[in-house]
Amino acid sequence: MALKKASLACAVCGSRNYSIKISGNLKPTRLEVNKFCKHCGKYTTHRETR
């Protein structure tokens, strides 16, 4: 199956800072990673948005 695009949105301010490619089959849980948010100016949890 082809890769699909998804975004990682900051849990604090909601801005979509990163884009990723995920496998075609959707999982029930969404990816959560700690990344730097340029709008907040600190490391925050970023969650996958579809």
Curated annotation (Swiss-Prot):
GO cellular component, one term: ribosome
Entry keyword Ribonucleoprotein: yes
Pfam families in the cross-refs: Ribosomal_L33
InterPro entries in the record: Ribosomal_bL33, Ribosomal_bL33_sf, Ribosomal_zn-bd
One Gene Ontology term from the biological process aspect of the record: translation
Highest rank taxon of the organism: Bacteria
Keywords annotated in UniProt: Ribonucleoprotein, Ribosomal protein
The name this protein goes by in its record: Large ribosomal subunit protein bL33B
Source species taxonomy: Bacteria, Bacillati, Bacillota, Bacilli, Lactobacillales
